[in-house]
Structure formats: C-alpha cells, structure tokens
C-alpha cells in the first residue's frame, strides 16, 4: 500500500514492491491532512465575488473587477490558533491598503461582493501595517508586500491577536508571553479565518497555510506543541494549528 510518508518518493509501496512512478508531484504536494485529522481550508461555498480556488482550497485568486472576502471552513470561539499567508498579489506593493488577513464572524454572503463591509464583523492586518476592523485602523504593526509571509496568531481565550511579517511581530508584541496584542471582544459567534481584497480593480493572490498542506515552499519546518503542522515560522508557545484533533482538545 502507499503510505505517502516519504515526500521524496510519494509513489513508494510500503510493502517494498510495486512502487508507483510519480508524475507531476513534488515533495510540497505531501499532505498530513487525513480522514482522522482534517486541517482547516478555505470555504468554497463562501465565494460571492467569484474568486478562483486551487491547491486544495488553499490558494485564492480574486477577481480584479470585484472586492472579495474569503473565509475558512472551520470556525472557532476559543483556543489559540496559528496560520500563515503568503501574499503573491501582483498588485501587492508595500503599504497597499487593499489586502487584509485576519478573522471575521459573519459570512461574506451578508454583504454581497463588498468584503470591506463584512470585515466590520472582524479584524485583520492590512498591507499598510495597520489593523483594520471595518470602522478604523490601529497603527504600529508591520506592513507586507508581494512574496511576504504573514503569520497570524489569534488568542480567542483572551481576545488578543498578533501579526508578524516574515517572522517579525509588529507593535513589539509577543504572542508567547501575551504582550502588546491587538485587543478584540470575543462574543457568541464563531470566528473564521479570512483573506480580504478590499478594492475593486486589485488582483489578490493568496497562498494559505493552516499546517496540513503546503502551497508554498517551507524552508524551516515548524510544528505546533502537539507535533502537527508544517510552518515557515515558529508556532508561538501554546498556539496550535487548526485541525480537528487540536480543535477537540483546545477549541
């Protein structure tokens, strides 16, 4: 049988015979998302603005004619969760306000194609280095541009969020110690992770890493405290990748 444990030989037969020839697969295509432990992905059903989904619903390409907001399939209201987004957007110049990565409580369906309106039910880091909550901005965080990786660590137990660009957390914050995070109110509605293109005419391309399947190359290989996930940057202490086993324990 094929156990897919060796990323360099995904067609390897664990019994030692009848190996398969790998075609159009690379080490990055190995996934630890299984029937006994599902990792979070983006939700194809929430796609009013007609974004294109690929790479197992972990790569989002927005339509340049519409503003767009896409959310994840798993929602949470407690626990501490970590994920990463690589911004491949051709329009993703430094200090660009169009792109937002964060979490929301409401479906984008409630506001049609206008993702910026739906973000009033949540918060996220904009490309200009400010946290946007739909009605105002909080400065002091790090901006991001094309090919940058944004780390998002959200503490739903204490209502704090932390954002890093290429491993550097803004606002002198530290999610492991709980210092200088962005404060938000955790209510009774579940939050889902979100990527947002707030301006029509912009082209957003986002690769999302929840830990189970990689859409961009990982050079360092970091797991959470339970040994799950594969991330470019270190998972903060007591934060976890969003999968069903961790969810049953911490969510």
Describe the residue ranges of each PLM region.
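PRY/SPRY (B30.2) beta-sandwich protein-interaction domains
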Residues: 1-251
């Amino acid at each position: 049988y094929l156990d897919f444990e060796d990323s360099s030989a995904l067609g390897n037969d664990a019994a030692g015979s009848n190996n398969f020839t790998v075609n159009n697969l690379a080490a990055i295509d190995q996934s630890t998302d299984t029937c006994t432990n599902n990792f979070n992905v983006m939700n194809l059903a929430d796609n009013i603005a007609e974004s294109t989904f690929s790479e197992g619903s972990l790569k989002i390409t927005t339509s340049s004619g519409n503003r767009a907001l896409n959310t994840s399939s798993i929602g949470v209201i407690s626990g501490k969760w970590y994920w990463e987004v690589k911004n491949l957007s051709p329009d993703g110049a430094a200090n660009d306000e169009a792109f937002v990565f964060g979490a929301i409580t409401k479906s984008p369906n409630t506001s049609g194609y206008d993702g910026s309106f739906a973000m009033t039910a949540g918060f996220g880091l904009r490309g200009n280095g400010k946290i946007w909550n739909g009605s105002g901005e909080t400065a002091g965080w790090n901006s991001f541009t094309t090919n940058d990786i944004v780390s998002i660590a959200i503490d739903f137990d204490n209502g704090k969020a932390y954002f890093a660009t290429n491993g550097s957390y803004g606002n002198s914050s530290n999610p492991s110690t709980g210092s200088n995070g962005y404060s938000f109110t955790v209510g009774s509605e579940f939050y889902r992770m979100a990527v947002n293109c707030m301006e029509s005419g912009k082209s957003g391309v986002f690769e999302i890493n929840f830990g189970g399947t990689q859409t961009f190359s990982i050079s360092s290989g970091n797991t959470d405290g339970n040994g799950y996930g594969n991330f470019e940057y270190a998972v903060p202490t007591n934060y976890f990748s969003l999968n069903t086993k961790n969810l049953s324990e911490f969510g």
